[in-house]
């Protein structure tokens, strides 16, 4: 398996527990989006429904906590939440402050 989120952290780790991590997205992806973070599930799974109900709740709790922290820190006009997985088919969420 050649999954970038399984073989590397995916960015600077801001926080992690035994199930997921929050990373700060850097480089070209983040130039126009200060505060751009990803919440990445540690175990390789392609779809949210591959997680147990308890794991889905845990992951979404971390996503919402990340959103709340970014709102407090940056006071953006809007926060975008997205989970697509087309380029990297590994469960992860984008949490993007918009200004």
What are these regions (language model features)?
Residues 1-99:
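HIT superfamily nucleotide-processing domains
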């Amino acid at each position: 398996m050649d999954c970038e989120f399984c073989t590397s952290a995916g960015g600077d780790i801001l926080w992690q527990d035994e199930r997921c991590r929050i990373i700060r997205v850097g480089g070209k992806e983040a130039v126009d989006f200060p505060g751009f973070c990803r919440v990445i599930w540690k175990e390789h799974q392609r779809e949210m429904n591959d997680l147990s109900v308890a794991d889905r709740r845990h992951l979404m709790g971390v996503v919402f906590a990340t959103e709340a922290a970014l709102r407090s820190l940056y006071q953006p006009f809007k926060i975008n939440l997205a989970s697509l997985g087309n380029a990297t088919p590994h469960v992860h969420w984008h949490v993007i402050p918009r200004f």
